[in-house]
Design a protein with these regions (language model features):
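Membrane-proximal basic amphipathic "stem/tether" segments
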Residues: 1-83, 275-283, 297-303
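A C-terminal cap/extension of S-adenosyl-L-methionine-dependent methyltransferases
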Residues: 25, 35, 158, 244-248, ...
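Conserved alpha-helix/loop element of class I SAM-dependent methyltransferases that forms part
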Residues: 93-112, 123-129
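Class I SAM-dependent methyltransferase SAM/SAH-binding core
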Residues: 113-165
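A short acidic, Gly/Pro-enriched loop at the edge of an enzyme's catalytic core
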Residues: 164-177
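A short SAM/SAH-binding and catalytic strip from SAM-dependent methyltransferases
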Residues: 174-200
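A short glycine-rich, Lys/Arg-flanked "PGG" loop and its adjoining helix->strand segment in the class I
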Residues: 194-219
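Conserved class I S-adenosyl-L-methionine
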Residues: 219-246
């Protein structure tokens, strides 16, 4: 089918972007202008044959995430937990499924309080989406060290602290998000400006602290790298036993676990048993064909929703 108008062209771009058929920069360029340096980074990434972590990779990944959550068709796949189109998120790391899953599971009620532990949502496009849906929402970002990105003018609060000892009263937040963070708790966090530890059970301490500050009927959304258990010193890859421990320790009134796996056809839904033997990829390559079958980082993720 041929769409003659610019409106139709933009409307159908997100789907083709997700399948890797259109450069990611085009979609947002048509929506609004980009700086020349930003565009140059995107062009550099695509000229590199989409090699992960090459110049422009981060920018291209964020563009991809934005186009996914802006696409009614693609976003509905996360809302309704249905299969993604073949090729979705190829050559990108697990963030391309974690962010849409988080946004699909947030409650956009008025006057709610949201705590982001990490904080992975500290991007303008994330905050714009949260505040456009709920302008009265109170958003608090928790991190170990200061983040260069600061949106205090959008009424976003920033708190420095350890998730194992949160500086908040009991039953305060309606929602808490924790995107690929809990696996770092109690580990070597020197790269994040913190200390060297090796306390493998402290993710449970963090979990119970988040439960403490969460209101009754509130939701805790957690994502972790998933597969066979691995200890890399600065983080752990969770296996099924550890995921089950999270649920058992939290004692939720309701819970759900969604798994996504990376294959030569990109990211898609998967059952836990088909992810259980996956290893985390720590290798880097300048050969784009390496990433057709090998994940960029995590080969699978567990997305856990816990209702207090």
């Amino acid at each position: 089918m041929i769409h003659n108008s610019k409106h139709d062209f933009i409307k159908y771009l997100p789907h083709t972007i997700a399948k890797g058929l259109v450069p990611y920069g085009i979609y947002n360029f048509l929506k609004k202008g980009r700086t020349s340096s930003y565009t140059n980074l995107l062009n550099s990434y695509h000229k590199s044959q989409k090699i992960p972590f090459s110049p422009g990779y981060q920018e291209a990944k964020l563009e991809f995430i934005q186009s996914t959550i802006s696409s009614k068709e693609l976003f509905s796949c996360f809302v309704h937990q249905i299969l993604l189109p073949e090729g979705f998120g190829a050559f990108f790391d697990e963030r391309v499924v974690e962010y849409p899953w988080i946004f699909a599971n947030l409650n956009y009620n008025q006057n709610s309080k949201l705590l982001d532990v990490g904080p992975a949502l500290n991007y303008k496009f994330c905050l714009d989406r949260l505040l456009s849906s709920n302008p009265n929402q109170e958003i608090t970002m928790l991190s170990l060290t200061p983040d260069a990105r600061c949106f205090y003018h959008n009424k976003v609060s920033y708190v420095l602290g350890d998730v194992r000892s949160l500086p908040f009263i009991n039953n305060y937040f309606e929602q808490i998000t924790c995107i690929s963070t809990i696996e770092h708790v109690g580990m070597n966090n020197q790269r994040y400006g913190s200390t060297v530890e090796h306390n493998l059970e402290d993710y449970i301490v963090a979990l119970l602290e988040m439960k403490r500050v969460l209101k009754n009927s509130g939701a805790l959304l957690i994502t972790v790298p998933f597969g066979t258990y691995e200890d890399f010193g600065w983080f752990q890859q969770f296996d099924e036993t550890m995921v089950n421990r999270i649920v058992e320790a939290f004692v939720p009134t309701e819970h759900s676990i969604t798994y996504y796996k990376y294959t030569d056809k990109g990211w898609n839904l998967c059952s836990s048993d088909l992810c259980s033997s996956i290893r985390y990829n720590t290798h880097r390559s300048n050969d784009p064909f390496f990433y057709t079958s090998n994940p960029v980082c995590a080969g699978a993720v567990a997305c856990i929703k816990l209702i207090k």
